[in-house]
Amino acid sequence: MARGFGRKKFCRFTVEGVKEIDYKDLDTLKSYITETGKIVPSRITGTSAKYQRQLSTAIKRARYLALLPYTDQHK
């Protein structure tokens, strides 16, 4: 089993000094959702726990308001 020696992940929101993640910022939210519509976990993205909670809440609010889809396009 090969072990990866990639770069250390960092929280983008901490580096940029973001106070709170907004559900209306769709460009940011789309980068944390997979093609199937799932929220990408923090162990993959490197997002800190504080911002991961805010991110998931913002994505769920955007889904509820139909700004983001719940699932992918079933074709």
UniProtKB/Swiss-Prot annotation:
GO biological process, one term: translation
Keyword Lipoprotein: no
SUPFAM superfamilies named among the record's database cross-references: Ribosomal protein S18
Entry GO CC: cytosolic small ribosomal subunit
Pfam families assigned to the protein according to its UniProt record, in alphabetical order: Ribosomal_S18
Domain of life: Bacteria
Matching HAMAP family: Ribosomal_bS18 (MF_00270)
NCBIfam families found in the cross-reference section: S18
Family: Belongs to the bacterial ribosomal protein bS18 family.
PANTHER family the record matches: 30S RIBOSOMAL PROTEIN S18, SMALL RIBOSOMAL SUBUNIT PROTEIN BS18M
Name assigned to this protein: Small ribosomal subunit protein bS18
Organism: Hydrogenovibrio crunogenus (strain DSM 25203 / XCL-2)
Gene: rpsR
